[in-house]
Amino acid sequence: MWLTKPSTPVSALLLLALALSPPGTQGRPQRSLAARVAELRPELFLPVTGTRLPPRASRSTEIFPRDLTLKDKFIKHFTGPVTFSAECSKHFHRLYHNTRDCSTPAYYKRCARLLTRLAVSPLCSQT
């Protein structure tokens, strides 16, 4: 049997009852989502018994201390014994401490070549 269309007075009464009803009874409650979820499923927030989460530090990647003499070791290996005169020390320090070639491990070989060229340049071999 087909349902008949509700009459106009019945639908008007339903709309009037909906408009006059107090807030919070018309659909969803007036609480925050977190309060509703916590009320419905408190077991979501509790850890499973018998299991223990590892501490945060052990889950992250370990950071090993960097060898500060690594740069010196690499450059001495590539250049051999190189000495700089007192007049050339300013240029050496600028190159050694302030360039990408001498501060990035991937470019240490290039740094060694630059330091070798600086050592034999006319600027540094004036003595």
UniProtKB/Swiss-Prot annotation:
GO molecular function: cytokine activity; receptor signaling protein tyrosine kinase activator activity; receptor tyrosine kinase binding; transmembrane receptor protein tyrosine kinase activator activity
Disulfide bond annotation, renumbered to this chain: C88-C124, C102-C111
GO biological process: cell surface receptor protein tyrosine kinase signaling pathway; positive regulation of ERK1 and ERK2 cascade; positive regulation of ERK5 cascade; positive regulation of neuron projection development
Keyword Ligase part of the UniProt annotation: no
GO cellular component: extracellular space; plasma membrane
Its job: Cytokine that acts as a physiological ligand for receptor tyrosine kinase LTK, leading to its activation. Monomeric ALKAL1 binds to LTK, leading to LTK homodimerization and activation. In contrast to ALKAL2, does not act as a potent physiological ligand for ALK.
Database matches in PANTHER family: ALK AND LTK LIGAND 1, ALK AND LTK LIGAND 2-RELATED
The protein's name in its UniProt record: ALK and LTK ligand 1
Naturally occurring in which organism (per UniProt): Mus musculus
Designated gene of the protein: Alkal1
